[in-house]
């Protein structure tokens, strides 16, 4: 037994469990913990988590480009309560808030309801934040400017969107609740998509050489579109797109066949007129604010 004990004592400890090894492992673990603490303290962990959630919500076709754009726009964040980081000039601060709100609103398509509604809330909070010379809350002036920016950036003709803006805008000093903000922004985005679809439809009707369509044909399509919209009892703007999408090829073919059946000469219809009249059908279904 004494010989066995001596042999056991003579066995050297494993190399990984020497005192210096234990110290290096301890230092590495401490460094890892301190790095994690640092990332957590400066907000990087939460920032990355939020960015990944945005990717899951929006499900973009190019996630890397989406993340690059996301982090680029993180620099536009303005202080909520003013302070040393507040840029000089109230106008500059307002433009930054508008830009950031627009960016949030475009992160997800309006058909992704949960993600879009969440982004609407974030945009509303961004515009409602107080500052040195601004009381918390969103006024009609800022809200109306945002709607104009949405329509302008969507490249819709001004004469097409102007009637809608008159319906959904608020007075400059009027307080705008979240429900009105959501309805107005959603309606603008849906109108832009509606006009884009109408433009694609006009391309099928137009004479490419003259860039105009036969008036009888254009009127037949507008009448069919109006019938589809009137048949929809839903008041939600997104449902108007569904109604327009239900224009089956049979109904359109019948309308076009009737239109070209006459032999009387017809005046041309321009793209601008077609889009304006198509948008008017949409806007007629929108309820005015208040």
Swiss-Prot record:
Gene3D superfamilies, alphabetized: cAMP-dependent protein kinase regulatory subunit, dimerization-anchoring domain
Top-rank taxon, per record: Eukaryota
GO biological process, one term: sperm axoneme assembly
Region (Disordered): 1-30
Alphabetically ordered keywords of this record: Cell projection, Cilium, Cytoplasm, Cytoskeleton, Developmental protein, Differentiation, Flagellum, Microtubule, Phosphoprotein, Spermatogenesis
GO annotations of cellular component type: axon; centriolar satellite; centrosome; cytoplasm; dendrite; microtubule; microtubule organizing center; motile cilium
Molecular function terms from GO: microtubule binding; tubulin-glutamic acid ligase activity
Function summary: Subunit of the tubulin polyglutamylase complex (TPGC). The complex mediates cilia and flagella polyglutamylation which is essential for their biogenesis and motility. May act in the targeting of the tubulin polyglutamylase complex. Required for the development of the spermatid flagellum.
Stated name of the protein: Tubulin polyglutamylase complex subunit 1
Protein's organism: Homo sapiens
